[in-house]
């Protein structure tokens, strides 16, 4: 193997999908288009945990009019809280163009102090209503399978891999 092949800036072999961890939603099923809802997504770290400066992303399709996650006003729609089970310090940001299309609407969660070991969790509460907020407004059009797609970069190489099973809901017409 040449030096160029060894250090070409790409991960030669991805981590096997079954070792990446898992993500689940607290609620699944049918939800009315345009309604305000709250969801808790829990990511459980896989075999390699998440290194200091590793990240997860929760991404959504670009064609949506849902409320963006926000972290500043707990009384406003879309208020989102993120916490690590082991008290690792997390940096959280929303970037509407933070991933490749069509999954470019990105909530990025980076471990900035500490690390996650296998079995540790990151809990994301979308549409928190505890402080008077309305929740997260779902998109106003129907979608049979609406994913909260989770990607993970466990070893901090900026090589985000898609989890093998994705949390999803169904967005249906109003009643």
Over which residues does each language-model region extend?
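Ser/Thr/Pro/Gly-rich, low-complexity intrinsically disordered stalk/linker tracts of secreted
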Residues: 1-175
